[in-house]
Every structure is written in structure tokens, then in C-alpha cells.
């Protein structure tokens, strides 16, 4: 049972709700029903959510596959926690300002590190099973 990945999937789902709520509140507050209405804050809220969505499903699938293939729980927690923290950091950085900043940079760095780490872990686990 992939319980560790289920835990991070649940945290990711909650983060998804928070980020989509930011978009919804901007829409209501600015009476924008579709698109960004030319509003930079609305545009940033949409990109924060969109950027999150672009990575979330892939990371959760990779995490679940890693767990199924027997990657250690310690590493699964490291990858899962780093992903969630990275996405929170990126969201804070991008929502605050469109300019490059430490939150945004550290968020994308953590996210990409998790993707690379999980890819390597999956390759190694797969090679152990095949070989």
C-alpha cells in the first residue's frame, strides 16, 4: 500500500484547494469571470495555480511508483516534503511579485530536485527489479 505517497497526495490536494481559492477570490473581488481581465494580480494568481498543477500530478505518480517499487520511506518523505515545501515557497514568491526572488527560486529548485531525485530512484529501483 502506497501510504506515504497517499499522505503527500492529500497534502498536495489541500494545497491545490488553497491555490485555487486565491484565484477564485481574485475573480470575485475583481469581477473577472474568464481569463485575467488584464489584471496583473489575477494573472499571477492564475500562474501560481497553473504552475503548481503542471508539476503536482507527475510528482505524485512518481512518488507512488517509487513507493510501490520499494524506495525507502525515508527518501519518500524527503521527496514528498521537499515537493510540498517547494511548491509553497514558489507560490509565495510568484504571488507576491512577478520579479525573480528567493522564494520563487528556491521553490523551483526544490521541485526540479525532487523530479530528478525521483527519476533516479525509479531508474535504480527498476534496474534492481529487472536485473
PLM feature spans:
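N-terminal signal-anchor transmembrane alpha helix
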Residues: 2-30
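Juxtamembrane loop-transmembrane helix junctions in multi-pass integral membrane proteins
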Residues: 3, 41, 45-48, 71-74, ...
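Physicochemical signature of membrane-embedded alpha-helices that form the seven-helix bundle of GPCRs
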Residues: 8-11, 46-50, 79-82, 107-110
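Cytosolic, membrane-interface loops and tails of multi-pass inner-membrane proteins
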Residues: 21-47
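Core segments of transmembrane alpha-helices
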Residues: 50-63, 115
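Mid-chain, well-packed structural core segment of small domains
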Residues: 59, 66-96
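Interfacial loop-to-transmembrane junctions
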Residues: 89-116
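Juxtamembrane boundary at the C-terminal end of a transmembrane helix
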Residues: 120-131
